[in-house]
């Protein structure tokens, strides 16, 4: 878990889903999204988080924010999108917490407005993270032949279907349509390259 309030700091190391335990996060400080993206760019590599002799799972990255960026996130986002193949191919989901969250920015970071879910209470947030984590694990264990954005959308839709079984949850899925999705498709799938960090 990478907290980005005043600066960015890892408050939980990389954890498998089976070992993850949710602790309530406290909002505080500013929203240094650029610092968080720079820190993620450093750690999302074979020399840091993705050390394995047996293979790698595609990362699932969940962004949560209750505000709008207070630093220059655009340069950091451009840099991580252009230089980090793990980020580029990761399944990215964004959670807008409360009315003050900048959904447009979260859509840019996740690459698709449909990968953004708005929540307004802690219980819904906890359930969303749990269900999205399990769903992400199941979907990312399949073959990666479709686009990464489609995987995020599939995860969100599956998660929302699971959450809709509980009638008192307050979520909104991809309602704002102002951000343009990033084009992540190309003829080169990048998996055969040796230049992954």
Describe the predicted segments one by one.
Residues 1, 92-94, 114-118:
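Conserved beta-strand scaffold positions in the cores of enzyme catalytic domains, especially
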Residues 73, 77-82, 149:
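Mixed-charge (Asp/Glu-Lys/Arg
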Residues 81-90:
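Arginine/glycine-rich "motif VI" loop of SF2 helicases in the C-terminal RecA-like domain
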Residues 1-12, 19-57, 60-64, 70-72, 91-104, ...:
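Von Willebrand factor
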Residues 122, 140-197:
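Extended acidic, low-complexity intrinsically disordered regions
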Residues 99-160:
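Von Willebrand factor A/integrin I-like adhesion domains
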Residues 12-19, 107-109:
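Short, flexible, mixed-charge acidic loops at enzyme active sites
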């Amino acid at each position: 878990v990478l907290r980005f309030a005043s600066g960015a700091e890892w408050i939980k190391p990389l954890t498998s889903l089976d070992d993850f335990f949710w602790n309530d996060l406290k909002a505080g400080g500013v929203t240094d999204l650029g610092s968080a993206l720079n820190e993620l760019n450093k750690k999302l590599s074979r020399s840091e988080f993705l050390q394995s002799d047996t293979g790698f799972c595609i990362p699932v990255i969940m962004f949560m924010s209750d505000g709008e960026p207070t630093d220059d996130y655009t340069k950091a986002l451009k840099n991580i999108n252009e230089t980090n193949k793990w980020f580029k191919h990761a399944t990215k989901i964004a959670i807008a917490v409360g009315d003050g969250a900048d959904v447009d920015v979260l859509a840019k970071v996740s690459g698709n407005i449909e990968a953004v879910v708005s929540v307004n209470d802690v219980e819904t947030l906890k359930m969303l993270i749990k269900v999205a984590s399990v769903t992400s694990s199941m979907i990312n264990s399949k073959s990666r032949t479709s686009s990464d954005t489609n995987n995020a959308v599939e995860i969100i839709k599956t998660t929302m279907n699971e959450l809709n079984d509980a009638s008192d949850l307050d979520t909104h899925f991809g309602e704002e349509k102002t951000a343009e999705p990033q084009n992540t498709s190309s003829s080169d799938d990048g998996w055969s390259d040796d230049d992954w960090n």
